[in-house]
Amino acid sequence: MGIDERKKQILRAIVLDYIATAEPVGSRTIARKYGLGISPATIRNEMADLEEMGYLEQPHTSAGRIPSQRGYRYYVDELMEPETPAEEEKLIIKTNYQAKVKSISEVIERTGQLMSQLTSYAALVSTPRVTGSTVQHVQLIAMGGGKAMVLVVTEPEKVHTRVIDLPENITAEDLETVSRVMNAKIRGHSLNDIRITILREIYLELLRHKAVVEYIMDLIEDSGESTEDRVYLGGILNILNQPEFRNVEKMKTLLSLLDQEALLSSLLAEQAGQEEGITVLIGDEFKCDLIQGCSLVSARYGVEGRAVGALAVLGPSRMDYARVTGLVEYLTRNLSRVLEKLYR
């Protein structure tokens, strides 16, 4: 049996009412509030059919119905239209991103705070994984005592330094020569480009200073491989205040999840690997048992080919999907624009 138009209208009304009230929904409520032009008796029969089809559930203590996971999934895929953020919300987002930013981590934290504030759920934002960071400058600075400082600047304006022991008989003029040749060869190139096409040329030209070149390349490699994901988590109290998590055991399970940064990082890394657009995971669609009873609305953000991360909103399955997906989509676009400016 398929879902006809009348059943779709009733299912949509039940999902919306349950999202708003967290109370099981009865046929009289649907008839009174949603103007479907159908009698309570007819609605009751349709609700029984929807329950038999697996789209609704009936809690033991109530005659009303609530959406099942399958019901939420059908609503998200077939019945929901993302809501455009209100003008006031757009202004809040615009104002936050116009403020002067000192670092990418500050942008990430600000985004997480915005998401949790605007959605009233928990917000997760992973730091962008740099996939094509380019080298902007290399310099060797003599320190005396047979030591030098290697300085490498990668885009966007990230400075990496390391003190090295110099080979015997190397002069300040030699250090300047190595710095000049390295800059001429690798400035503006990604680590991958340097490995594949440029490194052999550098070794041939600086054969006498191979040991120093290797020190520089070690630091460049380390700076380029610094891709450990960090996760900003905000709005924990928002989600704990939801009726679903007033149960102590459910609260403990959720807190256990939120305390595992590696797990959250893995979850967001998976979302960052998805195609562009919004991803909605509901209930047991998660691979992790700790997230049962929750939903995650996520999207990837970033500068293609350079840095990619993910942002997400975590809430109960009874999430306001239309509002959250609209906000996540809008925030993703704005965050990506900010990062594009930082990575110029």
From Swiss-Prot:
Keywords: Repressor, Stress response, Transcription, Transcription regulation. It comes from the Bacteria. The keyword Transcription regulation applies. GO terms for molecular function: DNA binding. InterPro entries: GAF-like_dom_sf, HrcA, HrcA_C, WH-like_DNA-bd_sf, WH_DNA-bd_sf, WHTH_transcript_rep_HrcA_IDD. Signal peptide: none annotated. Gene3D superfamilies: 3.30.450.40, Heat-inducible transcription repressor hrca homolog, domain 3, Winged helix-like DNA-binding domain superfamily/Winged helix DNA-binding domain. One of its GO terms (biological process) is negative regulation of DNA-templated transcription. Negative regulator of class I heat shock genes (grpE-dnaK-dnaJ and groELS operons). Prevents heat-shock induction of these operons. HAMAP family: HrcA (MF_00081). Belongs to the HrcA family. This is Heat-inducible transcription repressor HrcA. It comes from Desulforudis audaxviator (strain MP104C).
